[in-house]
Regions:
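Repeated loop/turn-to-beta-strand initiation elements of outer-membrane beta-barrel proteins
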Residues: 48-50, 108-110, 199-202, 277-280, ...
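Signature of Gram-negative outer-membrane beta-barrel scaffolds
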Residues: 1-107, 295-302, 307
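Transmembrane beta-barrel architecture of outer-membrane proteins
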Residues: 28-36, 56-62, 90-96, 116-120, ...
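Gram-negative outer-membrane beta-barrel transporters
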Residues: 203-340
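Solvent-exposed loop/turn elements at secondary-structure boundaries
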Residues: 66-95, 99-254
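Extracellular loop and loop/strand-boundary signature of outer-membrane beta-barrel proteins
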Residues: 21-26, 39, 80-87, 175-178, ...
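Short beta-strand segments enriched in hydrophobic/aromatic residues
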Residues: 44, 56, 102-104, 118, ...
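Residues on the lipid-exposed face of transmembrane beta-strands in outer-membrane beta-barrel proteins
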Residues: 36-42, 54, 98-102, 190-194, ...
Length: 340
């Protein structure tokens, strides 16, 4: 890097012959998410009530990336089950929820509450946009390594790529599986609230989440071979070895699903409000979160390449999530002036 001689770099460019001469062309994904929610509450007694609801989400993509027939024929010949030019079909995402509040005493000093249900967040359409930006048609990208002749003359190398004369350069492709489902989780919680002597409010709570559908990225341009690497003396350290597929593509990142992953958290919260405006609160949370891929990047190739795993192309090895926070302590101090 300091000598201006990188090992490799990634180059993305527009093919003006397919964009009407527009060298700043950028494909746009047109998408939207429609949501509907209905909820009702049943007061069984003065101390017990149940809340139930149903949320329906309808994510939709209104256009498609330009089909790449050359790639599609290649994928078909290799039985890759991948195709440029498709997006997930529009499907209803049904998320039922159920919750309850149960006061264990008539003075309402002790409350047991909980709930369970399926949850869908805002759909991350940015992951789907890779199929538009890396379709190998209007927008092209390639990874250039030091093995390319004339690597030190960057401008010449780039000119060769754009002019399609550097036949050794392999484009990067991003596709979406025909069976891809938008992320959803199943989540349950149970909490006990109790007023201690001195009007100190205590809350003990447990939350558990299980992945139903999450993202998983695989590279179809590499093949696993009969080799493994392992750290001597370290159990479960064996990792498979992959070779690049002999093809015209540097990477083929396929977006699909995994149902592996979970998280849990146990917390204790203590709160005290004084009559002169002072509010105090302190809490401790213990928990763990495990996932296959957190999808922290907007770029498909980065989500695959930088995912820590012994077998990043495997069926889904669980590891600690990048959002895993095993211990968290929070203290809050607030004061409300009588003047206001």
């Amino acid at each position: 890097f300091l000598n201006d001689k990188p090992n490799r770099f990634n180059y993305k460019y527009t093919d003006p012959s397919l964009t009407g001469g527009d060298t700043k062309y950028s494909p746009a994904i047109k998408a939207g998410q429609f949501g509907f929610y209905a909820q009702d509450k049943w007061n069984a007694t003065s101390n017990f009530n149940v809340t139930y609801g149903l949320r329906i989400d309808l994510p939709a993509v209104f256009n498609k990336p330009t089909a790449n027939e050359t790639f599609n024929q290649y994928a078909k010949s290799k039985n890759l089950d991948a195709q440029v030019g498709i997006v997930p079909s529009t499907k209803l995402m049904v998320s039922p929820r159920l919750g309850f509040n149960w006061y264990l005493t008539d003075d309402h000093k002790t409350l047991l509450r909980g709930g369970t249900g399926i949850f869908t967040g805002r759909v991350p359409f940015v992951w789907l946009s890779n199929a538009f930006n890396s379709n190998g048609v209007e927008m092209k990208s390639t990874t250039i390594s030091k093995s390319v002749p004339g690597m030190n003359n960057y401008q010449q190398v780039l000119n060769n790529v754009v002019n399609a004369s550097a036949t050794s350069q392999k484009p990067d492709i991003a596709v979406v599986s025909k069976k891809f489902k938008y992320p959803q989780v199943f989540r349950s919680n149970l909490a006990l609230e109790h007023t201690l002597p001195g009007d100190v409010k205590m809350t003990l709570e447990a939350i558990y989440s299980k992945t139903m559908n999450n993202v998983f990225f695989e590279n179809l341009a590499i093949n696993q071979v009969a080799k493994t690497y392992a750290v001597p003396g370290k159990e479960n350290s064996a990792a498979p070895y992959y070779n690049s597929e002999k093809s015209d593509y540097y990477s083929i990142i396929n977006l699909k699903n995994t149902n592996r992953g979970y998280s849990y958290a146990l917390s204790a919260l203590f709160e005290k409000t004084f009559n002169f405006g002072l509010d105090l609160a302190a809490s401790y949370t213990f928990g763990h979160s495990k996932s296959v891929n957190d999808g922290t990047s907007s770029v498909a190739y980065s989500n695959w390449k930088y995912n820590y795993s012994r077998d990043t192309n495997g069926k889904g090895e669980l590891g600690y999530s990048k959002f895993d926070i095993p211990h968290r302590v929070m203290v809050r101090v607030g004061w409300t002036s009588p003047k206001y």
